[in-house]
């Protein structure tokens, strides 16, 4: 009986290893496909609008509209490349952190203030709750700002308009705990545990502007700072 239990445990371990290997291979294939798609889409638009701007018969209003669209597509491509670069550095551990004493509540307020236009436009009612005491942590300010920004922007993209999103900051056993809750506008057709995987997006039709790397970067930056 003991031998049978041990053999079953070994078999279970092998099955899990095979399953993980297959999943890893599938993720690599999907990653390459998604990178190709997300780079190609804005790049194709840029090439198209550059060609359109070569038309000397364009009136000034149309020319300005094309230039504005060209700028938006260029910025999207720039953000995607920056996200890919950050994700690559985080995955390889080749990233520098500069810890300093931060008051997390103040940083949250600053990020929310900076993103006020975006949160208002989303139609989501953001409710931030802070503890009465200050919450000090040793963190890299720039990376932590990026974590908060990515999480909040993700809510503006995928939360159901007209609902509330809660940002709750607490201290538990000497550690800062930040909890964010919102009602999703999309039906998730994948396991919630995979939501922070690279290129996983809440909208499978990829209709929202984004790289699918925001939560993956937030997770990596959090874990690399001991969170």
Kindly give the residue locations of the regions a language model identified.
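A conserved beta-strand-to-alpha-helix junction within the catalytic ATP-binding
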Residues: 98-112
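Short alpha-helical segment of the dimerization/phosphotransfer core of two-component systems
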Residues: 72-77
């Amino acid at each position: 009986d003991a031998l049978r239990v041990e053999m079953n445990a070994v078999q279970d371990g092998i099955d899990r290893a095979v399953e993980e290997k297959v999943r890893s291979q599938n993720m690599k294939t999907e990653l390459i496909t998604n990178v190709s798609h997300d780079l190609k889409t804005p790049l194709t638009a840029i090439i198209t609008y550059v060609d359109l701007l070569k038309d000397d018969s364009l009136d000034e209003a149309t020319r300005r509209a094309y230039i504005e669209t060209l700028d938006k597509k260029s910025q999207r491509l720039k953000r995607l490349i920056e996200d890919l670069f950050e994700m690559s550095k985080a995955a390889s551990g080749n990233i520098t952190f500069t810890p300093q004493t931060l008051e997390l509540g103040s940083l949250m307020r600053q990020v929310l203030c900076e993103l006020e236009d975006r949160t208002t436009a989303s139609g989501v009612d953001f409710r931030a709750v802070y503890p009465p005491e200050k919450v000090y942590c040793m963190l890299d300010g720039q990376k932590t700002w990026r974590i908060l920004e990515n999480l909040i922007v993700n809510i503006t993209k995928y939360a159901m308009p007209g609902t509330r999103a809660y940002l709750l900051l607490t201290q538990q056993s000497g550690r800062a705990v930040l909890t964010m809750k919102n009602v999703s506008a999309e039906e998730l057709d994948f396991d919630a545990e995979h939501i922070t995987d690279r290129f996983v997006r809440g909208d499978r039709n990829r209709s929202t502007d984004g790289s699918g790397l925001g939560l993956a970067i937030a997770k990596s930056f959090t874990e690399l700072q001991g969170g």
